[in-house]
């Protein structure tokens, strides 16, 4: 496991930012650069079947070394290669902060960018630890390159210590998770695991098997542009209708006012003029009934405004993206309980809470591969304040190894 940090630092220098607007798969060609490197590393470890397919999915197998009549499940571990489109992942310059003293960390002196425990109180949990931060100009990429490094380090340990008994282990690294397409072309049958874990969580101890139900909404508002000097009773301003629609959504159901199991509507983009306005929303809720109610609410608002301004004034498209994996995990709760036990046995306190987002595992669970989520040790994903604790990374690898051990007994 001693090579874990070096691996991680190498991975984050490869720009794998995905792209919401791209129509190709994967959405950016640069993801192939990391995928090719990972195949080389896996083969160097002796995983001879390591392969990258035409869609940029990397898969590999560590065969069982157990001599037993007991049926040992085939376990998968999964992480994604892309980084968020929300901020640049190019020319990442990670900074090491050893023996953190609990004070402000200057990420970028020239731009006065400070990582402060005043703004991010979780930093206080890492006094005396080693942190890896950004230089304030990019994200870090711990989401999810830390997960990749932790999985490969676990494989390296097993290869270098053949006396450690283990069943068949499958690993996969996926593209385009950050733009919601990580599971689109994932071949569950080819992967061949009985169940899996995504190593894609945040702070040390996170163990998650509930996530949002998610939908995307596209709104197109048609107006009528008339010279403002002669516009009386004739002009229809599409931007104002879009504003009216937005005002009909519950004010208290926005991300900035919600937490825990509370769902929300989020206006993700708006662009327009008098003649035409386009809006994008996302809808999220853990509860399936409340999720459906939210979709109905926005549909009813559109119907009302079409009645007010004329049929066809607003075009609405609602697309379900993924669903809460809880219903697929509960029948096989032993995979959560084993992960909980593994954490406790390596000295990590489990933090079981709902994901306020989604993972590849959410969709994979509905594709026949139950797949809860385990921490990486990172914080503040998707932005310049992202950081990760090295000691937490080692613990993540220990948890992976302990899960493997518990299932091989």
Curated annotation (Swiss-Prot):
GO terms for biological process: peptide catabolic process; proteolysis. GO terms for molecular function: metallopeptidase activity; tripeptide aminopeptidase activity; zinc ion binding. Its main location: cytoplasm. InterPro entries: ArgE/DapE_CS, Bact_exopeptidase_dim_dom, Peptidase_M20, Peptidase_M20_dimer, Peptidase_M20B. It comes from the Bacteria. GO terms for cellular component: cytosol. Keywords: Aminopeptidase, Cytoplasm, Hydrolase, Metal-binding, Metalloprotease, Protease, Zinc. Zn(2+) 2 binds at residues 143, 178, 382. NCBIfam families: peptidase-T, PRK05469.1, PRK13381.1. Cleaves the N-terminal amino acid of tripeptides. This is Peptidase T. It comes from Alkaliphilus oremlandii (strain OhILAs) (Clostridium oremlandii (strain OhILAs)).
